Amino acid sequence: MNNGFFNSDFDSIFRRMMKDMQGSNQVGNKKYYINGKEVSPEELAQLTQQGGNHSAEQSAQAFQQAAQRQQGQQGGNGNYLEQIGRNLTQEARDGLLDPVIGRDKEIQETAEVLSRRTKNNPILVGEAGVGKTAIVEGLAQAIVEGNVPAAIKDKEIISVDISSLEAGTQYRGAFEENIQKLIEGVKSSQNAVLFFDEIHQIIGSGATGSDSGSKGLSDILKPALSRGEISIIGATTQDEYRNNILKDSALTRRFNEVLVNEPSAKDTVEILKGIREKFEEHHQVKLPDDVLKACVDLSIQYIPQRLLPDKAIDVLDITAAHLSAQSPAVDKVETEKRISELENDKRKAVSAEEYKKADDIQNEIKSLQDKLENSNGEHTAVATVHDISDTIQRLTGIPVSQMDDNDIERLKNISNRLRSKIIGQDQAVEMVSRAIRRNRAGFDDGNRPIGSFLFVGPTGVGKTELAKQLAIDLFGNKDALIRLDMSEYSDTTAVSKMIGTTAGYVGYDDNSNTLTEKVRRNPYSVILFDEIEKANPQILTLLLQVMDDGNLTDGQGNVINFKNTIIICTSNAGFGNGNDAEEKDIMHEMKKFFRPEFLNRFNGIVEFLHLDKDALQDIVNLLLDDVQVTLDKKGITMDVSQDAKDWLIEEGYDEELGARPLRRIVEQQVRDKITDYYLDHTDVKHVDIDVEDNELVVKGK
């Protein structure tokens, strides 16, 4: 048969070219290609020789075979599955997967869908962290154990990484070729089931995004999925399922949804017990049952934005890793190597009759052996509930360990602690303390904030200060106070400042400074709405839902939990009732400014009374204590005479303005004068403050 490429003239030209190249000194630097594939000079010479001894057709076949060899023996399509994924069933046989507890129902549903003749493609839908991937691993273990329908008892579950299908596909058609190889691999193996985690990524995956007609992964898979030629298990979240899969109705009907809900606290404890051995072996830390229960209980209470069992497992893992880092493991290999070296030294010492040296070496060997035995688990660290509390505190910033240890005593004494900081407002302090004790002791309904209060009274009597002290006492620092000045929320756009803008408006993607976002990041907070009477009526409408249901939906549709917050609103409205005003008089005044349904949502409406001079005596002591804290940084002590305190009270007393004028007098007459004295006497270590000629004077030592 005549061939225009492989004829005798071509063979002679090629042999002559090879002969010339073999005589060149630069052959080692040259590269040779056949059909675009690089071959070695030896293979090319062999092919040339074959071309001279055989027909043109045989020469062409030899060239093609060499190209295939150089391309690499990639083997069958089954090997391609191994290249792009993990065989979960094989890992289950090898005992590499964690046990799956409490998911029998979901595993059974998934197995039933897989055993169908057509459209046998389950998709696990659930929020992040509920254990969708673990269910697939549990199915792989069930296949190994034989606890599945006969139709899938021989299946191999291959976890496929979508990005590996796209890797290296810079040329048109390369991605489609990978998908075809994947499909052929599944068909040829006859027992492979593909698992795509985050399966919503298949929408548009591999498409060029242009009008050129390039197909994405989902478009290529649809025909094979509908005919049952391949079987796929998918996993995705509710939002991604709604926003991606459900929009493609042709793809949706090829999948069967398996809903995965968050496990209960009891089931999560059993899950932790099932995986405990793996964590103990990995970290060399003992994890008792009470620690596992604390992981679940504390993660539910203090990490509400995440779901079980993921958050409980994370707390357990972090705690064990922290304890393991504090007790570094002995390097077993190095220790055994050192023992072997010492054994040799001991034998040499005995041979040389150096018995004292041999005895010392034996003591060192025994010490290393004891150390090695201890590292094998006899003296491993044991986790405690307090360790779990410390982990929660590091994750959230909430002083959980402090509240855990002495919570009952702290609850009993909360009113005394607040009363020492908030002077002259015993009724307000007691009402707030009762609400907090009721919540922390577990005797409220649990579906509302810890407490919601309306503080009413004149300016400068401690309304804002009580909110600050609550944040410090309950949550450990004053940064837990979220303060909103309602004068900034009086316009019609106030709602967008609270919950963020909705879709279609500017700033939809940037809601970082809204109230809902602040509470999402710090769910344990005191929220202060200062001068609430100045707020837009729409703000008050939003607060109805917060105080009644304990949650609020932001502009992007996320439900924010307010159940661990304290809501405090302050107002100057109706403060003129005087010290002997009754509750009905307060309510009568409040109804002039607020709707009845708003007032009825509060746990308590608290009137703050005018401060008298006796109350200012305690307040001036607190203000002077703050001055002393500042002086401590300079190593200076301070004594203030009673006459000086009386003078400050007399100068700073104003019944209408409360304690703020007194704070201003202390700043001007005490802080400023101490500053002036310090600048003239930088070596001063002690100052005395007294009154002379109706003037405050500072003297130093």
UniProtKB/Swiss-Prot annotation:
SMART domains: AAA, ClpB_D2-small
Domain UVR: 336-371
Molecular function via GO: ATP binding; ATP hydrolysis activity
Composition-biased stretches (Low complexity): 58-72
Region named I: 81-332
Ranges for region Disordered: 47-79
Location of region: II: 383-575
Bias (Polar residues) ranges: 47-57
InterPro entries listed in its UniProt record: AAA+_ATPase, ATPase_AAA_core, Clp_ATPase_C, ClpA/B, ClpA/ClpB_AAA_lid, ClpA_ClpB, P-loop_NTPase
GO cellular component terms, semicolon-separated: cytoplasm
Keyword ATP-binding in annotation: yes
Gene Ontology biological-process entries: cellular response to heat
Key words of the record: ATP-binding, Chaperone, Nucleotide-binding
Alphabetical list of Pfam families matching this protein: AAA, AAA_2, AAA_lid_9, ClpB_D2-small
Annotated binding of ATP, by residue: 126-133, 457-464
Family: Belongs to the ClpA/ClpB family. ClpL subfamily.
PANTHER family: ATP-DEPENDENT CLP PROTEASE (PTHR11638), ATP-DEPENDENT CLP PROTEASE ATP-BINDING SUBUNIT CLPL (PTHR11638:SF188)
Free-text function comment from the UniProt entry: Required for the development of induced thermotolerance.
Name assigned to this protein: ATP-dependent Clp protease ATP-binding subunit ClpL
Species of provenance: Staphylococcus aureus (strain USA300)
